[in-house]
Amino acid sequence: MPGVANPGPSKSRRETADSSSRKKVHFSSIHDAVRAGDVKQLSDIVERGANLNEVDALHQFTPLHWAAHSGSLECLHWLLWSGADATQTTTRGWTAAHIAAIRGQDACLQALIINGANLATQDDRGCTPLHLAATHGHSFSLQIMLRSGVDPSVTDKREWKPVHYASFHGRLGCLQLLVKWGCGIEDVDYNGNLPVHLAAMEGHLHCLKFLLSRMNSATQALKAFNDNGENVLDLAQRFLKQNVVEFIQGAQYEGSHPDDHDDLAFPGHVAAFKGDLEVLKKLIGDGVINLNERDDNGSTPMHKAAGQGHIDCLQWLIEMGAESNITNKAGETPSDVAKRFAHLAAVKLLEGLQKYEIDDIESDKDHINFFTRHGVEGSTDAKDDLCLSESDKANARMRAHKKIVELRQLLEIAESNFKHLGGITEEDLKQKKEQLESKKTINELQGQLAYERLRREKLECQLDEYRVEVDQLKETLQKIQVTSVAAMEDDSCESSKEKRRVKKKVSPGGVFVRSYQRIRTSISSQV
């Protein structure tokens, strides 16, 4: 495939493109105009009769294929608006989505998905765009496709799934993303190879460690044989992968370094966090992770380096073309993270990349900063091959905004025409539905209110009856209390009289008896 290994234009080429003295080139073919990202000449060539789906003689690419290949996002938008066929394939069975996945053009891939591109289309080897993104280590492109609902466990003609491709090519970022989305790491291919077999035979130690840490039994995985009777150690020895051989023989997988488990998933982020520039360079240079790799929190290595104030790591990432406007799940850019941790040198370095001040942005399209770059521009997995100046990019944003205004006006006209013809719009239907629901709610509340009023009146009547009954009971109680008091007083008077009578009778008799006994006793003693 043309240009797959091309990492993008160099810094000097971009500086040349930004110079105001750049000469205007006139293109003779629609494919050249698309590769250069010149949407004006593309439009002119099509107006002169060029076919939107014209195939070039050398590579059998359509203009849409070339737009996805070079990252000509505006041209790709224009072609899709104009009706270009997104299902047309090359001689190898690649659609524009396949090429965007290979090149890591995630912005182009998003545009294709929005326009209905079929991500389940397989090429001549049975590979979908998902397989190709995993092969080339474009984890953000992979994530975009997974979020669109594509099957993460689709197989090619060799029964390889995306997880097999990521393991074989040592794409740790893609591998961990696929595992997170539920891809089976214990599935075998047509030769009985597990992903750990493929990682071992290619010497991808980071991927091997990660796979073993996520498998149900690492010991069983190392002992598992493929259809040729080879286990992980056999394959590593046959292909002379000494690092894997030493790892297995040293039994490091059995938990001798439990503190390193976080490093298995995001070693690049850990290196950036620690300021280990050499490890970071090696990981990115070897393709284990890409420059703008996201972790579970959406942070890139630049976020990690900015949070710790590692200026050397930040400078290297910037020189390599890392995107400084990516936001994590908290909505923070690397500059925001540096501010939060008060690393002023990092803040100054990162804010120097911005060509505008946030406070100066206005919603007025006539403002000078309205069409300047305000966020992530284009793809983040891989840089495009275009050499566009800042004015060209601003003009592209102006054209896109103009398209928005035109379509809004057309939509208003179309809605007005529809209403004039007796139709009803979705907005009107929604309003009527809301009105009906409001009316229904009001009626229900009014009925509830009437019921509560009747209930209140009934309760008030019962309350009046209870009050009358209480008054009657109070009167009866008072009468009973008065009668009982009078009776008690009469009883007390009678009892006191009876006591006095008994006292008078008993006292004299008792004295007489005692006197008689004393006299009798004295007579007896004398005798």
Swiss-Prot record:
Transmembrane segments: none
GO MF assignments: NF-kappaB binding
One GO BP annotation of this record: positive regulation of cytokine production involved in inflammatory response
SUPFAM superfamilies linked to this entry: Ankyrin repeat (SSF48403)
Signal peptide: none
Gene3D superfamilies given in the database record: Ankyrin repeat-containing domain (1.25.40.20)
A Pfam family matched in the record: Ank_2
Keywords assigned by UniProt, alphabetized: ANK repeat, Coiled coil, Repeat
Chain segments annotated as coiled-coil in the UniProt record: 395-484
Record bears the keyword Protein transport: no
Keyword Coiled coil: yes
First and last residues of every ANK repeat: 25-54, 59-88, 92-121, 125-154, 158-187, 191-220, 228-257, 263-293, 297-326, 330-360
Compositional bias annotation for Basic and acidic residues: 12-21
UniProt-annotated stretches for the region Disordered: 1-27
Entry GO terms, CC: nucleus
The organism's place on the tree of life at top rank: Eukaryota
Record's protein name: Ankyrin repeat domain-containing protein 42
Organism from which the protein derives: Mus musculus (Mouse)
Gene: Ankrd42
